[in-house]
Amino acid sequence: MRDIKTYLSTAPVLATLWFGSLAGLLIEINRLFPDALTFPFFSF
């Protein structure tokens, strides 16, 4: 179990999880607001 925790805390695994979640977030934003140069919740 300790080896699995050590493996999951290495940089390539964490980078893969981080970039995967970031890509998913950007995809969902582009799905909700297609071709948006300004987002409605950022305009003041």
From Swiss-Prot:
Signal peptide: none annotated. The chain crosses the membrane at residues 7-27. GO terms for cellular component: chloroplast thylakoid membrane; photosystem I. It is found in: Plastid, Chloroplast thylakoid membrane. It comes from the Eukaryota. It is a single-pass membrane protein. Keywords: Chloroplast, Membrane, Photosynthesis, Photosystem I, Plastid, Thylakoid, Transmembrane, Transmembrane helix. InterPro entries: PSI_PsaJ, PSI_PsaJ_sf. The keyword Glycosyltransferase does not apply. Its main location: plastid. The keyword Mitochondrion does not apply. GO terms for biological process: photosynthesis. Belongs to the PsaJ family. May help in the organization of the PsaE and PsaF subunits. This is Photosystem I reaction center subunit IX. The gene is psaJ.
